[in-house]
Amino acid sequence: MKEHHIPKNSIITVAGTVGVGKSTLTKTLAKRLGFKTSLEEVDHNPYLEKFYHDFERWSFHLQIYFLAERFKEQKTIFEAGGGFVQDRSIYEDTGIFAKMHADKGTMSKVDYKTYTSLFEAMVMTPYFPHPDVLIYLEGDLENILNRIEQRGREMELQTSRSYWEEMHTRYENWISGFNACPVLKLRIEDYDLLNDENSIENIVDQIASVIHDNQKK
């Protein structure tokens, strides 16, 4: 295993749509670097299953819950001095999910305004620790849908294809304008963490390059 040049206090965040493989990369990368993980706790979310059954009723509750949980995670990461790989970014909540439901009318304008005001007060400040790099996982929609089906979460399988199509499009639009921190784009078709040990080494090299280039600015 060759030496990497990623600072031990780095914060690396993995972003991308549902089913794209964020958790797998987060765990594999953290193990390779000797970092801690910050994982999305799907099973303990009191609103998620209710949300999938009734978007309009539960979208605001769910987004406030996510915002609070992710902010607490950021605080933990900051207080620990970094050295974390994080599954999903706090930026996706407002840039993708809350905005999508506001646009579709499944979150009221008042709730959306309240949510975005809270997000900006908590996150978009100089005091908030932004990641050293955001890894954006992208891939063909059909491959992502196959992964969702193979994962077999009932609440995801009951969700319409049109929902996943719209989310896929919104993610692509969102990342094109994202500038809160440096971005590394990876296509899921280009690596296989489960069957190819060299895949993670190539990813580590790319992360080190992005962080190094940003430090020179």
Swiss-Prot record:
Query: Under the GO molecular function aspect, what terms does this record hold?
Result: ATP binding; deoxyadenosine kinase activity; deoxycytidine kinase activity; deoxynucleoside kinase activity
Top EC category: transferase
The record's Pfam families line, in alphabetical order, gives:
dNK
- Give the EC number(s) listed in the UniProt record: 2.7.1.74, 2.7.1.76
Q: How does activity depend on pH?
A: Optimum pH is around pH 8.6. At pH 8.0-9.6 more than 90% of maximal activity is still observed.
**What is the reaction catalyzed?**
2'-deoxyadenosine + ATP = dAMP + ADP + H(+); 2'-deoxycytidine + a ribonucleoside 5'-triphosphate = dCMP + a ribonucleoside 5'-diphosphate + H(+)
Q: What does this protein do?
A: Plays an essential role in generating the deoxyribonucleotide precursors dATP and dCTP for DNA metabolism. The phosphate acceptor specificity is strict toward deoxyadenosine (dAdo) and deoxycytidine (dCyd). The specificity toward the sugar moiety of the nucleoside is less strict. Both 2-deoxyribose, ribose, and arabinose nucleosides are phosphorylated, although the 2-deoxyribonucleosides are preferred. The phosphate donor specificity is dependent on the deoxyribonucleoside substrate, but GTP is efficient with both deoxycytidine and deoxyadenosine.
Instruction: Name it.
Output: Deoxyadenosine/deoxycytidine kinase
